[in-house]
Regions:
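Sequence-level detector for tyrosine residue identity
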Residues: 4, 23, 84, 146, ...
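Generic preference for hydrophobic/aromatic residues in regular secondary structure cores
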Residues: 18, 38, 119, 176-183
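Charge-rich, low-complexity amphipathic helices
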Residues: 78-81, 119, 137-138, 153-154, ...
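Acidic two-metal-ion nuclease catalytic site recognized across multiple nuclease folds
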Residues: 160-236
């Protein structure tokens, strides 16, 4: 089974359909160094069968006539051997792939955005471009203008991920996945009237209300329930 860094560009943010998808294989060497597998690379534009929003056109530089004669986004298929899928805000990419009828039920997701927020909370931005400026300023200076092109974004993601793994002694994919799963559980509320408040300090009635919301992020749900269980244990 293999691991891939993937990036998608989409027609918009609501029910996103792919306009461009790129991926490349990655593997840890026996010495624990993250390396690219350039022979396992893919890049293609797709017709999203939806009008590309002005916002997406401005960000990606992909216009309706650029993809009018491209294959439909539903033609895309993940490699059959894919076990781990890595991306910056990977859940957005997963939504794009799901809308392209890809089955992700057995795929383990690794999120570099969550890892960066967890390991480097002091940074003023955790966007992919900002992280590239932080870890690889010389590369960023020459190439940041190509951000939001899927081919370049998977390269940027690799450089950011390689730096994170090196600094935190992550040497295999299973260890990286566990680090990502831990990082994806928030410790601070990122929205709502209690934005910025530590999960452990949230009012119990607000936690109860949140847990009843059908569209609650599963990692926030996990953080809330684990904290509630811990608080209950402390009272016993």
């Amino acid at each position: 089974m293999s691991s891939y860094i993937l990036d998608t560009e989409a027609h918009g943010l609501v029910e996103p359909h792919a306009t461009e998808i790129a991926y490349i294989g990655v593997v840890f060497s026996p010495a624990g160094e993250l390396i690219l597998q350039t022979h396992n690379a893919f890049e293609q534009r797709f017709n999203p069968h939806k009008k590309i929003t002005l916002g997406s056109q401005a960000i990606t530089g992909i216009f309706d006539d650029d993809v009018a004669d491209k294959p439909p986004h539903t033609d895309f298929e993940l490699p059959k051997d894919c076990e781990y899928l890595i991306g910056h805000n990977i859940d957005f990419d997963a939504d794009v792939l799901t809308n392209a009828d890809c089955d992700l039920s057995s795929i383990k997701r690794i999120c570099t955005l969550a890892l960066a927020r967890h390991f480097f909370p002091q940074l003023d931005s955790h966007s992919l471009g900002a992280l590239l400026c932080f870890f690889e300023p010389q590369v960023a200076k020459k190439n940041i203008k190509f951000a939001h092109g899927a081919k370049y974004d998977i390269w940027f993601t690799f450089l950011v991920l390689k730096a994170i793994c090196y600094q935190h002694r992550i040497t295999d994919m299973a260890q990286l996945y566990q680090a990502s799963e831990h990082a994806r559980k928030p410790t601070v509320m990122r929205f709502g009237k209690h934005k910025g408040v530590a999960i452990k300090d949230l009012p119990p009635d607000y936690v109860d209300w949140l847990l009843k919301q059908a569209d609650l992020d599963p990692y926030l749900h996990l953080a809330l329930t684990e904290n509630s269980a811990g608080n209950h244990g402390n009272l016993l």
